[in-house]
Amino acid sequence: MNNTIINSLIGGDDSIKRSNVFAVDSQIPTLYMPQYISLSGVMTNDGPDNQAIASFEIRDQYITALNHLVLSLELPEVKGMGRFGYVPYVGYKCINHVSISSCNGVIWEIEGEELYNNCINNTIALKHSGYSSELNDISIGLTPNDTIKEPSTVYVYIKTPFDVEDTFSSLKLSDSKITVTVTFNPVSDIVIRDSSFDFETFNKEFVYVPELSFIGYMVKNVQIKPSFIEKPRRVIGQINQPTATVTEVHAATSLSVYTKPYYGNTDNKFISYPGYSQDEKDYIDAYVSRLLDDLVIVSDGPPTGYPESAEIVEVPEDGIVSIQDADVYVKIDNVPDNMSVYLHTNLLMFGTRKNSFIYNISKKFSAITGTYSDATKRTIFAHISHSINIIDTSIPVSLWTSQRNVYNGDNRSAESKAKDLFINDPFIKGIDFKNKTDIISRLEVRFGNDVLYSENGPISRIYNELLTKSNNGTRTLTFNFTPKIFFRPTTITANVSRGKDKLSVRVVYSTMDVNHPIYYVQKQLVVVCNDLYKVSYDQGVSITKIMGDNN
């Protein structure tokens, strides 16, 4: 060894008491044995709007504790005609609500979307929940007997506070019967389809077939002690209102804020969807691909099959077509002598006043080149220059034809419109498919009448992404960084006498152009507060809401 290294050790002070960093004293743990346990549930249709509910009862004298719940769901074979695919992470999006109860009431519960949010940084959990090209890509059936999707099973990890530190945090049964209840979303929320797919029959025949698995622990001479858990509580604000309030807040560990689009029953049809590939570029490429067949047409005469309001012009020899204040260059090779190239100049357009600004999708293309195939009667596009963005891809079809639009907005062909897709994904956030557009310009949180926090930038979102290693567009105020399980979580504590028992959130939405159709997508503010509870095992399993620092 180097002399400097040797001397630095020899010269050390031996009189100082030092901790051993090369060995530890091993301790003999509680005697226990874990096992993977699976059970079937009892299905009912007692949920809101006749939603399916699965109940799983866990009562075994040899199961002392449990955690790490996994829900298995069978997806059936899909046959028929039309376009069809499952939404990404379909297993999570099947779930509306999960609760764990004992004879003393609900121990813990969570909304399906918050469960998904909690697992969004777990790539393995997301993969097993139904994220694959086989499930998520849009497949096509051409005859009634065509198989569109093969049967499959997805596995949904139900992340709970009882998983945080394995055995330490596990839910102890204390000789109690534990019931896990899962409420499912409507089938329309988990599929993407076009109008030719027979969804009515599929919906009638679709049956949720769940199985619950968990790790059960048999423990010898268990010594159960009280513990703390956080339980999320979600409040959804009124449509287009910038405020939402959570009441009866006594001890909260965090507060999260995000927005959701509200499409309603008629606004959930879109022009395109990329399927399994979910990057922003994939959304844009899928959208552009759908538009091109209507935008550039090779025909032996003026194109047919379009509405009378469509403005389709023949491309001149120099390839330059002027659309209002923009020029589009079009060059298609190998066009037969008896045919011409046409450009659709008002494919999709929107405006709130005549003779004012017009939002015209055709103008967003600046150069289009390709080659016409006489064998397939189609154009193979080689280079497309455009400014289409994720917001464009996220505009519901209904907004192009809404009463707010003073123009005939949707001038696509009937053939193209028939390929539009119904998308009712329940977990979409923001106003675009990727939640890229930050529509909150200012956030203020009040605890009672006092301002707890305010920001004019997305700092709380940036910190949430850094701390959770996920990018879901949620703004979060965290009041607890205390190591879990071994310490009582730190909370913001109420003072009821001073009116400090509610958290009020107010946002200022970002300014948007009223001539852009996305401006009219309705939105809702969502606030999620994590309340602190104490779990006791004196007489079965029960929880008590923490009301202050002294609990």
Curated annotation (Swiss-Prot):
Q: What triggers expression?
A: Expressed in the early phase of the viral replicative cycle.
Q: Which GO CC annotations does the UniProt entry carry?
A: membrane
Q: Where in the cell is it found?
A: Membrane
Which coarse location class describes where this protein primarily resides?
Answer: membrane
> In UniProt terms, what is the effect of altering residue 175 to Y?
Confers 50% resistance to rifampicin
Q: Mutating residue 485 to L leads to what result?
A: Confers 60% resistance to rifampicin
- Listed result of changing residue 222 to A: Confers 40% resistance to rifampicin
Give the result of residue 27 to K, as annotated. Answer: Confers 50% resistance to rifampicin
State what changing residue 485 to T does: Confers 40% resistance to rifampicin
The residues forming a coiled coil are none
Which one of the record's GO molecular function terms can you name? identical protein binding
Mutating residue 25 to N: what's the consequence? Confers 60% resistance to rifampicin
Q: What does this protein do?
A: Scaffold protein which forms a transitory spherical honeycomb lattice providing curvature and rigidity to the convex membrane of crescent and immature virions (IV). This association occurs concomitantly with viral membrane formation. Targeted by the drug rifampicin, which prevents the formation of this lattice, and hence virus morphogenesis. In the presence of rifampicin, irregularly shaped membranes that lack the honeycomb layer accumulate around areas of electron-dense viroplasm.
Subunit text: Homotrimer. Self-assembles to form a layer. Interacts with OPG158 (via N-terminus); this interaction is necessary for OPG125 association with membranes.
Q: Which family does it belong to?
A: Belongs to the orthopoxvirus protein OPG125 family.
Q: What is this protein called?
A: Scaffold protein OPG125
Q: Per the UniProt entry, what species is this protein from, by scientific name?
A: Vaccinia virus (strain Western Reserve) (VACV)
